[in-house]
Regions:
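Short, conserved beta-strand element in jelly-roll/cupin
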Residues: 125-143, 199, 207, 231-234
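A short beta-loop-beta micro-motif enriched in histidine and acidic residues
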Residues: 119-131, 193-194, 200, 223-224
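Active-site region of the double-stranded beta-helix
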Residues: 95-97, 121, 136-147, 153-156
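Non-heme Fe(II)/2-oxoglutarate
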Residues: 45-57, 165-166, 202-207, 211-276
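Short, charged/polar surface micro-motifs in flexible loops or helix N-caps
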Residues: 84, 94, 109-111, 141-143, ...
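Generic beta-strand structural signal
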Residues: 95-97, 101-102, 113-115, 130-136, ...
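Double-stranded beta-helix
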Residues: 143-213
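Non-heme Fe(II)-dependent double-stranded beta-helix
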Residues: 1-18, 24-117, 122-125, 243, ...
Length: 276
């Protein structure tokens, strides 16, 4: 892999400290075109894990989907053959990277719904520290069209928050897990938290830890906002079907305690020793 894709010690340190880091100009035009084409195809003919939300005031529309890489060759190539697995290896300091799944978030103009504050890993049937997401937008991101917001350093709180539906009609209720906590009312007390967000351009990436608390505002602009995320895991992450995890992300090949290596969670990067 070219040295052009070696992340600086400063970038890795920011990720480890804050739980999120912005990577500028990392997705080239070829990959952006592939993402755009696949997203448009999914909007026209959604894949099997499509989900929509009831929007506020009856305006706008939210189009969501996941595990798209299993159905679109271009997205499979992006998830496996782009620089993302290599970035994950560096940020997680892992000698092995598995693809977990990918996810699409399209907010049409005037979709005012927030994506509620949450951390991701309680929704997922996996356990272990080295878990990361890379989120990119195919449209410029500003405060008007729903930027991602993060609470700095919240991945180190040691908190697993009970999964909840993101909007009415989004999905069935999540099972209650007695080991998880109810998330506090962050939105009504924003001044008590160290909240950060980022303006972005197409080609930029947000890398964030699976336990960092985050959400996003609605899209009050007149333009579409197309967000796409890919999730990866590092070494020693195991499969776990405790209450609360999303049923559509579970893997029939595995049993609790297994390493993730499987058709659904393939190994996409491997090296004989730790990257750093």
């Amino acid at each position: 892999m070219s040295n052009d894709f070696v992340l600086s010690r400063e970038i890795i340190s920011v990720f480890e400290k804050n739980g999120v880091v912005l990577l500028k100009n990392m997705i080239n035009n070829k990959w952006q075109r592939i993402l755009i084409d696949a997203i448009e195809e999914d909007i026209k003919k959604p894949g099997p894990f499509f989900h929509a939300y009831n929007t506020e005031e009856g305006k706008g529309n939210f189009h969501g989907n996941m595990r798209l890489w299993e159905h679109y060759q271009g997205l499979k190539d992006y998830c496996i053959n782009s620089t993302l697995p290599y970035f994950a290896a560096q940020l997680l300091n892992s000698n092995k990277i598995n693809l977990f799944y990918d996810q699409l978030f399209v907010k049409e103009p005037e979709t005012k719904n927030r994506i509620r504050w949450h951390n991701d890993q309680p929704y997922w049937p996996i356990r272990g520290w080295p878990v990361i997401s890379f989120w990119t937008s195919l449209d410029p991101i500003s405060k008007e069209n729903g930027p991602m917001e993060f609470i700095r350093k919240s991945h180190k709180w040691g908190k697993w928050y009970q999964p909840e539906n993101f909007a009415p009609g989004a999905s069935k209720a999540y099972e209650k897990n007695p080991e998880f906590e109810k998330i506090p009312d962050i939105e009504s007390n924003r001044d008590k938290y160290d909240i950060i967000s980022f303006d972005m351009n197409p080609g930029d990436l947000l890398a964030f830890h699976a336990l960092v608390v985050h959400g996003s505002a609605g899209n009050i602009s007149k333009d579409r906002r197309r967000g796409y995320a890919v999730r990866y895991t590092g070494k020693d992450v195991i499969y776990c079907t405790e209450k609360g995890s999303h049923l559509d992300l579970r893997n029939p090949e595995l049993k609790d305690g297994d390493l993730l290596d499987s058709k659904q969670y393939p190994v996409v990067w491997e090296k004989g020793e730790n990257f750093l």
